[in-house]
């Protein structure tokens, strides 16, 4: 990651419009049970989610790349509960204490097969990108549709990037928007005008430096996706 940054001239570093989120996906034991121990199926689902997230964030001038995939095949490293406040805090503490020491990354997402309490399907801290503890989200894998999982993950990462839920004045070309307060039956791949403004306001005001540097191609573990030069590097 640092080498890739060093290989660019100062002018390239200044004028590169993109931010880069290096993400680790963590899959819990309930997911392993849900997919009958089929780790290849789980990996493929996670790779597709990462690639879909990257496509969604391109319009925000972001690249989202998977630099780590951890599957808790034997036992969970934290207690995953339906209580989202408890689980989010537990995952954040584990990320700060253990995961950061094992793998350099900017953001971590826990994907679980348990059913969160109430109607919640995702939960994250707001405005926390690059924080050593709070740059995390938790996601319930409730739908068999791969795109739905990616939309929820993009939504929760959006909260990490300082984006709040859309209101009636936000739009994204007539489609349902990613940061809507609830997921639509036909989930969209687009962020709203409000999301764009809030995200870049957060970046300008808080300067989360961990997303400034372009990762090395060798750090990216998700398979190439046609038309995406970063993933094919």
Swiss-Prot record:
CDD domains: ZnMc_adamalysin_II_like. Residues 19-215 form the Peptidase M12B domain. Keywords: Calcium, Complement system impairing toxin, Disulfide bond, Fibrinogenolytic toxin, Fibrinolytic toxin, Glycoprotein, Hemostasis impairing toxin, Hydrolase, Metal-binding, Metalloprotease, Protease, Secreted, Toxin, Zinc. InterPro entries: MetalloPept_cat_dom_sf, Peptidase_M12B, Reprolysin_adamalysin. The active site is at 156. Its EC number is 3.4.24.-. Its main location: secreted. Expressed by the venom gland. Binds 1 zinc ion per subunit. The keyword rRNA-binding does not apply. Ca(2+) 1 binds at residues 22, 106, 210, 213. One of its GO terms (cellular component) is extracellular region. Optimum pH is 7.0-10.5. This recombinant protein is 95% identical to the peptidase M12B domain of the zinc metalloproteinase-disintegrin-like acurhagin (AC Q9W6M5). Negative results: does not activate plasminogen. Belongs to the venom metalloproteinase (M12B) family. P-III subfamily. Snake venom zinc metalloprotease that acts at several levels. It has direct fibrino(geno)lytic activity (Aalpha chain of fibrinogen is cleaved quickly, Bbeta chain slowly, and gamma chain even more slowly) and degradation of TNF-alpha. These activities permit to protect against sepsis and disseminated intravascular coagulation. It inhibits ADP-induced platelet aggregation in human platelet-rich plasma (IC(50)=65.4 ug/ml). This is Zinc metalloproteinase recombinant fibrinogenase II. It comes from Deinagkistrodon acutus (Hundred-pace snake).
């Amino acid at each position: 990651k640092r080498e890739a940054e060093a290989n660019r001239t100062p002018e390239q570093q200044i004028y590169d419009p993109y931010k880069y989120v290096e993400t680790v996906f963590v899959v819990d034991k309930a997911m392993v049970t849900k997919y009958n121990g089929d780790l290849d199926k789980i990996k493929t689902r996670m790779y597709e989610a990462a690639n879909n997230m990257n496509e969604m964030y391109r319009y925000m001038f972001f690249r989202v790349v998977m630099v780590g995939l951890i599957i808790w095949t034997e036992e969970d490293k934290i207690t995953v509960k339906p209580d989202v406040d408890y689980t989010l805090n537990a995952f954040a503490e584990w990320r700060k204490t253990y995961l950061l020491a094992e793998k350099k990354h900017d953001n971590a997402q826990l994907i679980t097969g348990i059913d969160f309490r109430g109607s919640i399907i995702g939960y994250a801290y707001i405005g926390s990108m690059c924080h050593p503890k709070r740059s995390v989200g938790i996601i319930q894998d409730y739908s068999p549709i791969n795109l739905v999982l990616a939309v929820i993950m993009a939504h929760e990462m959006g909260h990490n990037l300082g984006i709040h839920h859309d209101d009636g004045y936000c739009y994204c070309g007539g489609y349902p928007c990613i940061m809507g307060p609830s997921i639509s039956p036909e989930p969209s791949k687009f962020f709203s005008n409000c999301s764009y403004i809030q995200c870049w306001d957060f970046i300008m005001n808080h300067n989360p430096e961990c997303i400034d540097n372009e990762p090395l191609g060798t750090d990216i573990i998700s398979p190439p996706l046609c038309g995406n030069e970063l993933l094919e590097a």
